Amino acid sequence: MIHPTAQIHPTSIVEAGAKIGENVVIGPFCLVGAEVEIGAGTILHSHVVVKGITKIGRDNQIFQFASIGDTNQDLKYQGEPTRTIIGDRNRIRESVTIHRGTAQGGSVTVIGDDNLLMVNVHVAHDCRIKNRCILANNATLAGHVELDDFVIVGGMSAIHQFVIVGAHVMLGGGSMVSQDVPPYVMAQGNHAKPFGVNIEGLKRRGFDKPTLHAIRNVYKLIYRSGKTLEEVMPEIEQVAAKESAISFFVEFFKRSTRGIIR
């Protein structure tokens, strides 16, 4: 079903069965598959390919040569009906690739709201990107990677399969990340190592001084106390009971399976 207010360039192909919402614009030479749903106000600028069981929300901008929802690169994939879901108000720049999920990984690749994926970013099968993340040019996420809110991934960085990157993390350009990165941390290198708290980013997002002080103290517990993570967790949980921002650490460590960067 194509909404009567949608604008579709005559050189584009929209297969029968696709659902195209109100005020959607599909520019020249695009291909939209039969099982695709595109929400109101979204713009496909030109030469965009959207395939598979893919749902795209409202007011997204998708630039030329982006490929969304196509077959993933997992060698175990046998054509199972898996999905790609993209939220609202994302900017997906030129030549970005976002692959559908696998049956082994929950069957869905998910991108939330208000994210910016710059030129040549690759998001592999079963990744989950939350909200307000920025992935700079040529950043690569392997399968099953999770990015929590407000993560910044520098250009030319690569993140290993199954890695979790906590909220408000900043990864410097050219980083190779093979283990989980706790919330609020700045990291860089091959392999990426932590080098402090993302103070400037947190200030820009309205974190007050007492909260920043609490986050710094937890960072010191994790990285400078000389204790194991198991030894410091009771202290972190005590702080989290009083300071909600610290609860991100507690939730993160419950999910972490690969160990954390050191």
Curated annotation (Swiss-Prot):
Keyword Cell inner membrane among UniProt keywords: no
One GO-annotated biological process of the protein: lipid A biosynthetic process
Keyword Metal-binding belongs to the record: no
Catalytic activity, EC: 2.3.1.129
Gene Ontology annotations for the cellular component aspect, listed alphabetically: cytoplasm; membrane
InterPro entries: Acetyltransf_C (IPR029098), Acetyltransf_C_sf (IPR037157), Hexapep (IPR001451), Hexapep_transf_CS (IPR018357), Lipid_A_LpxA (IPR010137), Trimer_LpxA-like_sf (IPR011004)
Keywords noted in UniProt: Acyltransferase, Cytoplasm, Lipid A biosynthesis, Lipid biosynthesis, Lipid metabolism, Repeat, Transferase
Listed pathway(s): Glycolipid biosynthesis; lipid IV(A) biosynthesis; lipid IV(A) from (3R)-3-hydroxytetradecanoyl-[acyl-carrier-protein] and UDP-N-acetyl-alpha-D-glucosamine: step 1/6
Top-rank taxon: Bacteria
Entry's localization field: Cytoplasm
Pfam family, one: Acetyltransf_11
Entries under PROSITE patterns matching the protein: HEXAPEP_TRANSFERASES
A molecular-function term among this protein's GO annotations: acyl-[acyl-carrier-protein]-UDP-N-acetylglucosamine O-acyltransferase activity
Principal subcellular localization: cytoplasm
Catalyzed reactions per annotation: a (3R)-hydroxyacyl-[ACP] + UDP-N-acetyl-alpha-D-glucosamine = a UDP-3-O-[(3R)-3-hydroxyacyl]-N-acetyl-alpha-D-glucosamine + holo-[ACP]
NCBIfam families from the UniProt entry: lipid_A_lpxA, PRK05289.1
Family membership noted in the UniProt record: Belongs to the transferase hexapeptide repeat family. LpxA subfamily.
Function: Involved in the biosynthesis of lipid A, a phosphorylated glycolipid that anchors the lipopolysaccharide to the outer membrane of the cell.
Subunit text: Homotrimer.
Protein name: Acyl-[acyl-carrier-protein]--UDP-N-acetylglucosamine O-acyltransferase
Organism this protein belongs to: Pasteurella multocida (strain Pm70)
